[in-house]
């Protein structure tokens, strides 16, 4: 009886591990698919304390669109905390995303976001880079994303300068 119970426990443990690995691999595959096939969009970086931008081997990011969303939802962050929402966006001629009025004919695209704490979370707030290459990213003015048209998920694939040239 004890041996059967022990064997059943092992089977349950192995199945749980397989399930977790399958879920993680599915999430990774979804992000990779978005990065490979998504629409190129750029989000303007918002000003941030320069001493806080470069932290070792990563750069803290803040996006102007997130600031706009926070202002438009002022006073409701507590009620919205953790909830997923979609921001209607339009792209200018350069591919830079701007918040659109919800009923605008130009807002065929949506960007998925969530409130974390008191801030809008657009999927990332940091960009990691190779040790010793911080100087290269000091001229960053935009985050370069791939946007899934169907889900609204955006994957950061790099940073760009004022001319949208990759860094």
Feature annotation, model-predicted:
Residues 1-11:
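N-terminal positive-inside, membrane-proximal cytosolic segments immediately preceding the first
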Residues 10-27:
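Hydrophobic membrane-insertion alpha-helices, especially the h-region
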Residues 11, 79-111:
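Short peripheral tails and domain-boundary helices/loops at the edges of structured domains
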Residues 23-43:
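Aromatic-capped interface at the extracytoplasmic side
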Residues 38-40, 58-60, 82-86, 94, ...:
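Extracytoplasmic
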Residues 44-75:
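Short extracytoplasmic
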Residues 67-79, 95-99, 153-156:
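Short, Lys/Arg- and Gly-enriched loop/turn segments at beta-strand edges
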Residues 99-102, 110-167:
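Extracytoplasmic/periplasmic terminal helices and flexible tails
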